[in-house]
């Protein structure tokens, strides 16, 4: 079971590496890692389990965050606010297309690998199309917008050594870009 002690923190070199693509079939170890990542997200969102194990709540986790520089992410978002849920374990995810229009969370973003609150708006694409494989190597294609699009972009950034705060404007951290949509 993954706990907070397994999640590496900001400053660890793995968080700035470009993760390696995986080939199929996945090793049993990689499959177990991906399942454990999903399990962490579910546990972190369960109040009792999170309290028992000292877990911070999360909706996404990338393998580099547990010091595995591999292109694997898990997203567990039981309700996106519009009645749609997202429960994915993805391998080698890629953003294939994206909207010009940007979106941001008015409260900024957080990260399980970043302990402190870093104020500032993170502008991302409002819509994205993602291609990946599931744990068995089947092709997956997702069209996302709004909050789910932001979550998946955040996790894919981890696979490329990018942290959310890299996008925050140092001069005007709380100023929304023109035409950007608040999510």
From Swiss-Prot:
InterPro entries named among the record's database cross-references: Peptide_deformylase, Peptide_deformylase_sf
Necessary cofactors: Fe(2+)
Protein source organism: Staphylococcus epidermidis (strain ATCC 35984 / DSM 28319 / BCRC 17069 / CCUG 31568 / BM 3577 / RP62A)
Catalytic activity line of the entry: N-terminal N-formyl-L-methionyl-[peptide] + H2O = N-terminal L-methionyl-[peptide] + formate
SUPFAM superfamilies referenced in this protein's UniProt entry, alphabetically: Peptide deformylase (SSF56420)
Protein's gene: def
One Pfam family this sequence matches: Pep_deformylase
Name the record gives this protein: Peptide deformylase
Active site annotation, chain numbering: 155
Its EC number(s): 3.5.1.88
Residues binding Fe cation: 111, 154, 158
Domain of life: Bacteria
Sequence similarity: Belongs to the polypeptide deformylase family.
Keywords: Hydrolase, Iron, Metal-binding, Protein biosynthesis
